[in-house]
């Protein structure tokens, strides 16, 4: 087996449990997140609900920025180069870039879900926010351990967003009636 094939298999081995966990969490979101107070059934309340849950991705990004900022004052990173000598700082910068991208994509998806989901299904947004936060943490820790170790966290954070885009696109462009 080639080293490349081995890395692919390790990535798949990390991604599969994330797929199962995401599917189970979203399937049982009503039970797991039944304690969450749903908003009034009007567009502004729905969007405010989604925005409040965007704090979890925001905190993930803020944590990465704070860690990178603190690491920027150590001797091997004080010059501010894009490729610092510190492996940990380089991974943190990559985490921040990817978290920024994922946060933007999630925000667009969740705003669309907030407007289009039936009110009882809005509980999916807190479920996705929780998966996002756990996934970003697992991505960061896994990446620090070994690059292919980031697969579980990447899939756990990204899969609900991808599914959201698919559902919203289907609804918007295929004329799925209410």
Language-model features: where?
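Long, highly hydrophobic alpha-helical transmembrane signal-anchor segments
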Residues: 1-59
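Interfacial loop-to-transmembrane junctions
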Residues: 6-7, 138-163
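Small-residue-rich segments of transmembrane alpha-helices in multi-pass membrane proteins
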Residues: 17-20, 87-90, 153-168
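Transmembrane alpha-helical segments of integral membrane proteins
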Residues: 34, 128-144
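Membrane-helix interface/capping segments
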Residues: 36-39, 62-86
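Core segments of transmembrane alpha-helices
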Residues: 57-58, 97-110
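Short membrane-interface loop/juxtamembrane segments of multi-pass integral membrane proteins
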Residues: 80-103
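Juxtamembrane boundary at the C-terminal end of a transmembrane helix
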Residues: 166-178
């Amino acid at each position: 087996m080639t080293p490349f094939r081995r890395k692919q298999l390790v990535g798949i081995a990390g991604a599969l449990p994330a797929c199962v966990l995401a599917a189970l969490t979203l399937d049982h979101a009503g039970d797991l997140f039944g304690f969450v107070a749903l908003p009034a059934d009007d567009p502004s309340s729905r969007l405010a609900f989604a925005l409040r849950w965007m704090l979890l991705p925001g905190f993930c990004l803020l944590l990465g920025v704070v860690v990178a900022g603190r690491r920027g004052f150590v001797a091997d990173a004080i010059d501010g180069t894009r490729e610092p000598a510190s492996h940990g700082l380089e991974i943190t910068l990559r985490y921040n870039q990817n978290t920024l991208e994922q946060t933007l994509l999630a925000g667009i998806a969740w705003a669309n879900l907030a407007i289009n989901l039936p009110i009882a299904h809005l509980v999916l947004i807190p479920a996705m926010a929780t998966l996002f936060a756990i996934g970003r943490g697992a991505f960061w820790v896994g990446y620090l351990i070994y690059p292919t170790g980031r697969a579980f966290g990447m899939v756990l954070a990204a899969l609900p967003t991808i599914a959201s885009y698919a559902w919203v696109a289907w609804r918007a462009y295929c004329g799925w009636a209410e």
